[in-house]
C-alpha cells in the first residue's frame, strides 16, 4: 500500500511539474509588453535608431559587456549617454522583466 501511495505521489508531482509553465514565461511576456511601450521606439527588433552600432544583438551586447541581466538592468535603471533612465518610470520588477526579454530576444536573434 505504501509503495502504491508513493507511486501516486510521484506521478502527481511529475504531472504538476509538466503542466506548470516555466517560472519566467510570465515575466518574459510582461517584458515584451514593457519593451513595446518604452523601448521599441529606439530599439525596434533589437536595432538602435539613434546609434546603429549600439544595438541589442547578442554580439554587440557581449562586445560592450551588456550580456547579463545585471548589466541590462543597470542601464535601463540609470540610463547612459542618449539612453534615458527608467528608474522613475518602471518598477524594479518591470526592469527585471524587460532585461530578461532583451536577453532572450538577443539569444534568438530578435526573430
Curated annotation (Swiss-Prot):
UniProt key word Transport: yes
Which superkingdom heads the taxonomic lineage of this protein's source?
Bacteria
Gene Ontology molecular function terms on file? electron transfer activity; heme binding; iron ion binding
Keyword Transferase present in the record's keywords: the answer is no
List, alphabetically, the Gene3D superfamilies matched.
Cytochrome c-like domain
List keywords of the entry alphabetically.
Electron transport, Heme, Iron, Metal-binding, Signal, Thylakoid, Transport
Q: What main location does UniProt list?
A: other
Q: Please state the span of the N-terminal signal peptide per the UniProt entry.
A: 1-25
Q: Which residues bind heme c?
A: 39, 42-43, 83
Query: What post-translational events are described?
Result: Binds 1 heme c group covalently per subunit.
| CC per GO annotation | plasma membrane-derived thylakoid lumen
Q: Where in the cell is it found?
A: Cellular thylakoid lumen
> Which PANTHER family does the entry link to?
CYTOCHROME C6, CHLOROPLASTIC (PTHR34688:SF2)
Which family does the record claim for this protein?
A: Belongs to the cytochrome c family. PetJ subfamily.
NCBIfam families found in the cross-reference section = Cytc6PetJCyano
Name of the protein this chain belongs to: Cytochrome c6-like
Species in which this protein is naturally found:
Nostoc sp. (strain PCC 7120 / SAG 25.82 / UTEX 2576)
Amino acid at each position: 500500500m505504501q509503495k502504491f501511495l508513493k507511486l501516486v505521489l510521484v506521478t502527481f508531482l511529475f504531472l504538476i511539474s509538466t503542466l506548470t509553465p516555466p517560472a519566467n514565461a510570465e515575466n518574459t511576456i510582461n517584458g515584451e509588453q514593457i519593451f513595446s511601450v518604452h523601448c521599441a521606439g529606439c530599439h525596434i527588433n533589437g536595432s538602435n535608431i539613434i546609434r546603429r552600432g549600439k544595438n541589442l544583438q547578442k554580439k554587440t551586447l557581449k562586445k560592450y559587456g551588456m550580456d547579463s541581466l545585471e548589466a541590462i538592468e543597470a542601464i535601463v535603471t540609470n540610463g547612459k549617454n542618449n539612453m534615458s533612465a527608467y528608474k522613475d518610470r518602471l518598477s524594479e520588477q518591470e526592469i527585471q522583466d524587460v532585461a530578461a526579454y532583451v536577453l532572450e530576444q538577443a539569444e534568438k536573434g530578435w526573430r
